A protein has these predicted regions:
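Terminal-region recognition feature
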Residues: 1-168
Length: 168
């Protein structure tokens, strides 16, 4: 569904909603999201934390995927319904999970290595990939992991001596 993914415009929405709020009362945040852009997600988390510190409660009535899950992790608690879902933290590029792109590239490499004739099948597919795209995927995966861990360490696990190991 176009326009439903987390993007840079969403931070403006949060800023509009939070305008003149009493931040000392905390935030009850309802999330229903398929996920979205990693940079936008990180920016939203940082903005929420700057305004409400660790006084954020998150409610997931149905689903919160990828970037939505990372935002949910910034709360000190998450409440969900019996049929609600938190999705994996899997950054997307053009609605394709970065890890899936890397796995497909590895599959192509392995297949062509074991049978060079398969190159004729894979080359048209691989030629569509920009030279830096695989590195972008790797960096997005690592960045997403760091965002999730930081959110947990400074949120739900704040003050826990085992926060880092639990977040990993």
């Amino acid at each position: 569904m176009p326009g439903a993914y987390i993007n840079d415009e969403d931070k403006n929405g949060f800023m509009s909603c939070f305008y003149q709020m009493d931040f000392s009362k905390g935030l009850d945040l309802f999330i229903h999201s398929p996920g979205g852009d990693v940079a936008a997600t990180d920016s939203i988390i940082n903005y929420i934390r700057a305004k409400f510190k660790d006084d954020v409660r998150v409610f997931v009535p149905q689903l919160s995927m990828s970037g939505g899950t990372m935002i949910a992790l910034c709360g000190k608690e998450i409440s969900m319904g019996s049929h609600s879902n938190l999705g994996p933290i899997d950054p997307q590029f053009g609605h394709f999970p970065a890890q899936l792109v890397l796995s497909e590239f590895d599959r192509a490499y392995q297949e062509m290595k074991s049978d060079p004739q398969k190159a004729s099948v894979w080359m048209p597919i691989l030629s569509q990939i920009q030279p830096t795209f695989l590195t972008q995927c790797e960096r997005a995966i690592e960045w997403s992991k760091q965002i999730g861990e930081k959110a947990l360490i400074t949120g739900m696990f704040a003050g826990d001596p085992d926060a880092t190991s639990k977040a990993e």
